[in-house]
Amino acid sequence: RKNKKGRKLIMGKRTKQTITLGSGNLYITEFSGSIPENTEIEKDTNLAGYIQGGAELEHKPEYYTAEDDLGKAKKTIITKEEAKLKSGIMTWNGETLKKLVATGRVTEDTKKGIRTVKIGGIDNNDNKSYIIHFVHKDPVDGDVRVTVVGKNTAGFTLAFAKDKETVIDAEFEAAPSDDEGTLILLQEEIEQTA
């Protein structure tokens, strides 16, 4: 196959011609020191809820440049990295909020049919880190997975309006997930060889 300019198109999964289009699913589960296989994370019990507005991954490095007065010698090094994964969670409940707030506690009284979420009180900080795992499914061009370990650092706003759904905009700041200092784990589904 060729494009309009007569160039040969490379067919297959996740090539340089692949257009990534669409949203995906967001999974959140407690981090216990290592990131498990995708099948362990991608369970219904770990689904944060359905999302609105997709997901956004941001990587922001900081650099330091040393330069002589005459501009003849120059060296630039990376001094710091920051990574964030942002998403809007549209379907949620108290269990979702507990994963978004370090001071959140959830109790359920099944006899009364009430789930209670308590938020606040610095002494209630659970100091937990979570695996935040976004999956963009594409059966033709291949799936893309983005995984970070971190905490929601944006807090949340619950806006209850008569003509708009309530969406929690979460912003997870990534922390190193291994001994190499990995902040972002991005996996692409590619063609398999025999």
Where are these regions (language model features)?
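A generic structural signal for short beta-strands and their flanking turns/coil linkers
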Residues: 53, 81-85, 115, 128-130
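Mixed-charge, glycine-accented linear interaction segment located at domain edges/termini
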Residues: 142-194
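Extended, positively charged loop/linker patches that create polyanion-binding surfaces
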Residues: 99-138
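Oligomerization/assembly interface segments of phage tail-like spikes and tubes
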Residues: 74-97, 163-177
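A glycine-rich, hydrophobic loop/mini-helix early in the fold
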Residues: 45-81
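Polar/acidic, low-complexity leader/linker segments enriched in S/T/G and N/D
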Residues: 6-49, 194
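Short acidic, glycine-rich loop/turn motifs
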Residues: 30, 134-141, 174-176
